Amino acid sequence: MDEQNHIARGLAFLRTGDPRLSLEHPPLINTLSVLPLLTMPELRLPTDHPSWERREGWYEFADLFLWQYNHDTARIVFLSRLPIVFLTIALGLVGYRFAFHFWGRAAAVPALALLLLEPNLMAHGRYATTDLGATLFTFLTTFLLWRLWLDSSRWHWRRWLPVAVVMGLAFGSKLSTLGFVPIWAVLALL
């Protein structure tokens, strides 16, 4: 389970502003997932432990945070998962809108059902990790770009602004979303 790493990383960044634990992923989704933990001011981060100072000590830091320094582990994990569940619901709604835009309501409802019942989304749509946030913002960026390309006669900065914001959210979610830049470029040429 690497969930404790994401939770500890997000809370450490939110409380200290120090990105030292965010070596693998940008802090956006990790920080978003721990926002409900602000309702628990008694939570302690092990910043007094040597693992805070060591670059390779972040696994130990996360284990200490979740299993030793704090005692309400179930509540910490539950609250950290809530924002990811909402991102999963948002992904379903974007999938619905995508299908509705291209094929109408007859396709949108089954698309929503298939998306929300898809085993990978059901499995990962509740974990406090960066996967769902990256999926949501990458899919939303692709959808917005596709709509822009379909109606290229109305290219205006106001129509590009939401695309740029959502693309920035995708890049802020997970580093692997940068791999979609060439895909989006190829789609633009089609």
List the model feature ranges, each with a label:
Residues 82-102, 140-144:
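Transmembrane-helix motifs of polytopic, lipid-linked glycan transferases
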Residues 141-159:
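Membrane-interface transmembrane helices that cradle and orient dolichyl/undecaprenyl
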Residues 111-116, 123, 143, 167, ...:
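Short helix- or helix-capping micro-motifs
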Residues 20-83:
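Interfacial juxtamembrane loops and adjacent helix segments
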Residues 1, 126-134:
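Short acidic/glycine- and proline-prone juxtamembrane loop motifs at membrane-interface regions
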